[in-house]
Amino acid sequence: MIVNSLSLCYHNKLILAPMVRVGTLPMRLLALDYGADIVYCEELIDLKMLQCKRVVNEVLSTVDFVAPDDRVVFRTCEREQSRVVFQMGTSDAERALAVARLVENDVAGIDVNMGCPKEYSTKGGMGAALLSDPDKIEKILSTLVKGTHRPVTCKIRILPSLEDTLNLVKRIERTGISAIAVHGRNRDERPQHPVSCEVIRAIAETLSIPVIANGGSHDHIQQHVDIEDFRQATAASSVMVARAAMWNPSIFLKDGLRPLEEVMQKYIRYAVQYDNHYTNTKYCLCQMLREQLESPQGRLLHAAQSSQEICEAFGLGAFYEETIRELDARRADLLAKTPEAVEEPAEDTSGIIKMAIRFDRRAYPPQITPKMCLLEWCRREKLPQPVYETVQRTIDRMFCSVVTVAEQKYQSTLWDKSKKLAEQTAAIVCLRSQGLPEGRLGEESPSLNKRKREAPDQDPGGPRVQEPALPGEICKKPFVTLDSSEENLLEGC
């Protein structure tokens, strides 16, 4: 996907803000449906992106940037190619340019996060830490402007002093960036503090480039008409909406907010169509439900442990099944057209024990997996640890793993979405062929449970091993323990 150089205009636009864990592809597409002109992805760290490989996903019709562990870090599609802005977290000009060149043919703009106050960002010299180093800001932005053919922007917070703020933004403007987004709070302020509209106004009146006002959710923006009021209060060219859009993306719709259940169902459809990980889907839906998490539907969402269960909670079970059938058919069609891309494990298959099975996470307790059970059995039998060898098909990026135990190989004939799932499936084949328990609900290994309970007492002075989250904690935690700093994280940093 290639779009015209420097074609993105930041004048008089409604913009979806970058939000950690929220600004993934389903939310961006939904915001575009409801009237957003520009959508930002969540902040992605430069070092993480530089480990990624660009992959064209023909099954989903997307472009994926995939980490070495096979996790999709950034996914985009043709629908948003001329309106999506890639936001990075960086503290180094050369790394920033390398990331920009990696993604520039698949996005419409490049943005640098210079406002996130969270420790994970500032400790690395990124986010709000850059505000105290204008020389580094200038180097990063100048390097990007000169080195990429996409419009470059940055998103900042204001400084405690208006004079210092204006001096900084004037220096930023001289780097040649196309626009600047301003969150009207300083790095120590949180959403409960009032947004400084007058400071954003002073910036807008000082600069000649578009100024994008941010930080007005809740206090100023509760419905669509409020967006224009906030723009006028700040004299900004455009408005960037974060939390209000996270709560209900139809805030961008001129005709007014749509019913929340309708919005959530539309979001879920995009999540399934684009194979969004269910934990991310669940998190975003929880942000929309907010105080309704204790409702019957909220409890169903709370308990959901897969995309299918999320769909069933919202009456979309049939849609899920139909979509999966369509994706499977598309995958099979692609494989049929390119048989040379169907890769089998490199080993001689004559001695491999095979079964047509897949690992289903829902059938196992949160703390127990087939791989754990197989490893424990090997230890008891004084056998070498299991050895997993995994291959990936080029055409659909599916995985198949072969596990070797006591010189015997085991493999499933069904391919999985990830290397981790494929390894779990191979472990199941081995365990079932030996008639061994695999840790399914109701048949947990006593030795595994014993090891789990005794672990904290083995070395009282050593580091504690964090237990995996219980089902639903991903959904529930933000609304039980969400403090002001966490809310600030959602405001787009």
Curated annotation (Swiss-Prot):
Q: Name one GO molecular function term.
A: protein kinase inhibitor activity
**Claim: Transcription regulation is one of the keywords in the record:** no
Question: Gene behind this chain?
Answer: Dus2
UniProt KW Phosphoprotein keyword: yes
Post-translational modification Phosphoserine, affected residues: 445
Q: What is this protein's name? A: tRNA-dihydrouridine(20) synthase [NAD(P)+]-like
What reaction does this enzyme carry out catalytically? Answer: 5,6-dihydrouridine(20) in tRNA + NADP(+) = uridine(20) in tRNA + NADPH + H(+)
Recorded superkingdom: Eukaryota
Q: Where is the active site?
A: 116 (proton donor)
Question: Which SMART domains is this protein grouped with?
Answer: DSRM
Q: What is known of its domains?
A: Efficient dihydrouridine synthesis requires the presence of both the catalytic domain and the C-terminal RNA-binding DRBM domain.
- Tell me one GO biological process term: antiviral innate immune response
